[in-house]
Amino acid sequence: MVDNTSIATKSALQAAFSSASSLPLLVSSPGAHGQSGGGGGMKLEAVMENLQRQQAARLALEEKLRQAEKEKDIRSMVESQIQQQALAFRHYQAAVRGAFAAGVPNSSSGHPLERRAESDIDDEDDEDDDPELDRGMDDEERDMDEDDSMNEGGGDEDLEGPLAHYPPRHAVYPGAGQSPKSTPIHLSRVQPPYPAPRQAESPSALAPQAQSQHHEWTYEEQFKQLYELDDDEKRKEFLDDLFSFMQKRGTPVNRIPIMAKQVLDLYTLYKLVTEKGGLVEVINKKIWREITKGLNLPTSITSAAFTLRTQYMKYLYPYECEKRGLSSPGELQAAIDSNRREGRRQSYGSTLFNYSPVGTPTLLASPKLQMPHISMPTPNGGHMTQTPGIKKEDSMLSSCLTNRVGIPMSLAGHHSAAQAAAAAAVQAAALEQLREKLESGEPPEKKVMLMAEEQQRIMQHALQQNLFAMATQLPMNIKLNNRDDRQETALNLSTNGISSINMSIEINGVVYTGVLFARKPAIGFMPSSQRVHHQHSSQGKSNSPGLSSHIQPSSSASSSASSHGPATSP
């Protein structure tokens, strides 16, 4: 066809040139033969019309030639691409068959691999929309996959599920990603959330692999199990809505939580919690055990409440706030903080005022309020001073609180340890209460006054309780009273930090009387010199050892008594 058109074009061009060359002859002929001017004009017009027709025919032929050449180039390009696609597809099929025959290692099961290999062809339209997946493929391979997807047909139906908008997960299968000619073939494709089951080529060969790796669920299998846990019609609707909401929120669900070796039923968890009034109500009422039973989880799971609360906050609580509005994030944080403080108060209350004859060598302290250690006098007159360490948000409170209250007694070693443990427990509880009061936002001046009063009251109460506890455990006769004619000054507490306590203790017939004066804390938390007034009266000769007590809170005093007369505490 091309040859015929070229020959016709050449003949037309020759005819046009010959007619053009004969034009001067025709023009000059009228003068030579003596014809009239009118006849010469008509011939000239006829020649011009003939030339115009020939030129139009020549242009039309040239246009046809150009179109024919374009069609020929396109046809040859398409034929070459089809041949390349067919060759690459044969290599691809050979690689897949070789992978199945050899048994692909590191794959969860045979069925997901086959589904991925088939969906690599069916879902190529989605792959063209993703620039990251196209990065490793050239134009010819993309054309090949597009052509194959047209031949297969119906490939997009698998992606019409509720989770088609989620980003794909890339899985690499070693040994199945290269053809026999080392042509890179990409097998990492996203599988639909719950695709229709397909029959494997050799189920008997793939069954052992599926059984050996039964517990290693893939991302798609987890979603499929979540949708197929029961036949509730609202389950699919809820899960579709939940995943769409999380995707729009910018926090897509990329994995399903596993609890007790099974997929956590998000639908049932949400339904149980919202029926109880929402997450905040469940936390405040502490009914996580009912939620655990409703989910058919074993009750022996450790920290099940914490795990369920964490997973609910991550996957379901934003959806609850959006759809139901049962609580706000501020209320949730307040409920969590309240639950945490309650747990600490219970642990403190269990050890408060408990006396143990053995005691513990270490002293308890508040976990969140760490204050400096005090200097303790030793029997040989030396001092053991520990480096102060303060860790508190409010710096002005550092000079008003202490970390430990030591009451070393010369009766026995375990007596002093028990006294110290009980006093430390008392102070830990007091410091926890003070911390909660301080967090309520009171002025700094009022905080200091409240702490001074609280410390003085706690220390006197701790002394009395500890001595009574020893009296119940040991065969001693102890009397504790306030001997002072002025009853109003027996316990003098004031808000300016100045106070005094008159104490009288009788142990095994020996009476120890003293006045505890308040003093202001030193700058470096070192004990300052203080005089202590005391009286000593004995009924008969007694060689019982003296009782020396050293109490050093922030607004308390130090006192020591012995059988030799007045003494000054270091």
From Swiss-Prot:
Instruction: Answer yes or no on keyword Phosphoprotein.
Output: yes
**SUPFAM superfamilies (alphabetical):** ARID-like
A biological process (GO) of this protein is: regulation of transcription by RNA polymerase II
Tell me where in this chain the ARID domain is found. Answer: 232-324
Q: Which CDD domains match?
A: ARID_ARID3C
Region (Homodimerization), start-end ranges: 475-495
* One MF annotation (Gene Ontology) recorded for this entry: DNA binding
Query: What is the role of the protein in this entry?
Result: Transcription factor.
What protein name does the entry list?
A: AT-rich interactive domain-containing protein 3A
Native source species:
Danio rerio (Zebrafish)
